[in-house]
């Protein structure tokens, strides 16, 4: 998606350790116009798959997921990283490791909001090592829900996440695919 690539080039920053900082439009401050276009792109890609719900992880996946949900006219469910007083029982839970934060988190979704009647689209902000998406796939499996596709905002194609997700047989679509972040230069793969 050319618009997203332009935002990444103009407002993204490469940090040591192949970290891409995109807090100017995705991870801290959100650009609603960009989110709307991303939502439309995900909807266009997955519109014929019978999606009944979109599932993501708090917090940076929520904005793109909501705009995709709006475009597809389906609800959005986000997995919580921390349990609250209102989210204690009847949960589907998976443990995911965050390479950016260097720690594992339990993510949970209420059984009330995900069932075997659902066909879901997983949406996440980044694909690097694939652990977040795999955790959401595990939750979907626990619920008996069908996963029709995985939508990624920014994919670091030089890491193993895509390869791991491809092994599941579930279609993966990334709006921006980064080939390299070496020498603080952002290089993209061609669009899918």
UniProtKB/Swiss-Prot annotation:
Keyword annotations from UniProtKB, A to Z: Cytoplasm, Glycosyltransferase, Purine salvage, Transferase
Gene3D superfamilies registered for this protein in UniProt: 3.40.50.2020
Swiss-Prot/TrEMBL catalytic activity: XMP + diphosphate = xanthine + 5-phospho-alpha-D-ribose 1-diphosphate
Binding residue positions for 5-phospho-alpha-D-ribose 1-diphosphate: 128-132
Residues that hold xanthine according to the record: 20, 27, 156
Classification via InterPro entries: PRibTrfase_dom, PRTase-like, Pur/Pyrimidine_PRTase, Xanthine_PRibTrfase
One MF term in the entry's GO annotations: xanthine phosphoribosyltransferase activity
Cellular component aspect of the GO annotation: cytoplasm
Subcellular location: Cytoplasm
UniProt keyword Transit peptide, yes or no: no
Pathway(s) the chain acts in: Purine metabolism; XMP biosynthesis via salvage pathway; XMP from xanthine: step 1/1
Keyword set includes Calcium: no
EC number: 2.4.2.22
Main location group: cytoplasm
A single GO BP: xanthine metabolic process
HAMAP family referenced in this protein's UniProt entry, alphabetically: XPRTase
Task of the protein: Converts the preformed base xanthine, a product of nucleic acid breakdown, to xanthosine 5'-monophosphate (XMP), so it can be reused for RNA or DNA synthesis.
Complex and partners: Homodimer.
PANTHER family: HYPOXANTHINE/GUANINE PHOSPHORIBOSYLTRANSFERASE (PTHR43864), XANTHINE PHOSPHORIBOSYLTRANSFERASE (PTHR43864:SF1)
Family of the protein in this entry: Belongs to the purine/pyrimidine phosphoribosyltransferase family. Xpt subfamily.
Protein name per Swiss-Prot or TrEMBL: Xanthine phosphoribosyltransferase
Organism: Listeria innocua serovar 6a (strain ATCC BAA-680 / CLIP 11262)
Highest classification ranks of the organism: Bacteria, Bacillati, Bacillota, Bacilli, Bacillales
Gene from which this protein is expressed: xpt
């Amino acid at each position: 998606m050319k618009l997203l690539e332009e935002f990444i080039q103009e407002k993204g920053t490469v940090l040591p350790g192949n970290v891409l900082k995109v807090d100017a439009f995705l991870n801290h401050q959100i650009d609603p116009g960009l989110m709307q276009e991303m939502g439309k792109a995900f909807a266009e890609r997955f519109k014929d798959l019978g999606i009944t719900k979109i599932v993501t992880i708090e917090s940076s996946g929520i904005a793109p997921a909501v705009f995709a949900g709006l475009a597809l006219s389906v609800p959005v469910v986000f997995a919580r990283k921390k349990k609250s007083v209102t989210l204690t029982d009847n949960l589907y839970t998976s443990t995911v490791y965050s390479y950016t934060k260097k720690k594992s988190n339990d993510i949970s979704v209420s059984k009330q909001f995900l069932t075997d009647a659902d066909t879901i689209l997983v949406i996440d902000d980044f694909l690097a090592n694939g652990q977040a998406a795999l955790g959401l796939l595990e939750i979907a499996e626990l619920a008996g829900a069908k996963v029709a596709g995985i939508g990624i905002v920014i994919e670091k194609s030089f890491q193993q996440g895509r390869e791991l997700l491809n092994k599941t047989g579930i279609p993966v679509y990334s709006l921006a695919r980064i080939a390299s972040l070496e020498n603080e230069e952002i290089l993209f793969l061609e669009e899918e």
